[in-house]
Amino acid sequence: MGFRVLVLIVMVTTSALPFTFSEESGRSPFRPALRSEEAQALRHGLTLLLARRADGQTPDMHQPEMRRPEMRRPEVRRPEVRQPEFAESPVGQKRWDAYDCIQFCMRPEMRHTYAQCLSICT
């Protein structure tokens, strides 16, 4: 019961008190406390938290829907890096995989470490 009251107080505070005191010189003593997006994200997170708590699940702040939108990591695809010496082979020959690339890269005449070859080939 106490947890729900605390959450409701926070939700009401973010929507009912849009201003806080600011002591910066040259500005109005009042400024918006939270941008509307921040307040909306906070309310959304608290609503999800209450729903999970009501279902008996423990809240997991690492799940993307519990984070503020600007904290979510965008889905990034790692671009494929093509090295000139490891170019695609002609038709009929086996295409190199990362293991073959590392084996070639670590030959003594290449003078690369395993870590360097791993970063080159993957």
Curated annotation (Swiss-Prot):
Question: Superkingdom, according to UniProt?
Answer: Eukaryota
How is this protein named in the record?
Conotoxin flf14c
* Record field: compositional bias (Basic and acidic residues): 62-85
Family, as annotated: Belongs to the conotoxin R superfamily.
* Keyword annotations: Cleavage on pair of basic residues, Disulfide bond, Secreted, Signal, Toxin
Q: What is its main location?
A: secreted
Q: Which residues form the signal peptide?
A: 1-22
One GO MF term on file is: toxin activity
Q: State whether keyword Disulfide bond applies.
A: yes
